[in-house]
Amino acid sequence: LNYIMTVINPDALKKLSDICAQLEIPMSVALHGRGTAIESMRDLLGIDSTEKWIVFSVAGEEKTKEYMNRLRRTLYIGVPGHGIAWAVPIKSVGGGKILAYLNDGRQDARYTPEFNFSYELIVAIANEGRTDTVMNAARAAGAMGGTVLHGKGTTSPESEKFLGVSIAKEKEVILIVARKEQKADIMRSIMTRAGADTDAGAVVFSVPVSEVAGFGMFDET
């Protein structure tokens, strides 16, 4: 199973919903977000706005591949400015019925497919209004851009004391997909320039990505 995240322009949401319905992909949730590409990059890609929709879905291995293929064919994911998508492998699911629901009726989760983790998803949780600080740090280490979600921290007071920052505030969640070779440098730069000891108060971690679409423009030729 994979947890799929797709970042698209607002006018593509209906088509993406149709793809999910056609493939019978359950548990699709759409959230409003914004891109972080700098103006020169937006001009290069022909992007007029940073407004985005982030769609979260769950799908098995085969459906994930078909989903990515349809994104490329139908939404032109891979063409600059049309969006990106990535999938994170799910290690476990609570309950056999839920597993069957998410995995086309199959409850056997013993098979673990082999993945080539060429990319990783970097997640940085920072104080509200500090996205630019985080992204400037990330770009200094080679990141091309990211997607921002707005939220609120819910951590206990004990965690606040441990980290030395206030967690129960408005937060920005910055999602950055990067090549695995760049991941350590990007995370190190964020921690140094925007980490827990700074005004940004960023906490950063990464997870492997099993499938991607829309990142070919960054590939070396």
Go through each PLM region and give its residues:
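Positively charged, small/polar-rich N-terminal and surface patches that mediate targeting and assembly
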Residues: 1-221
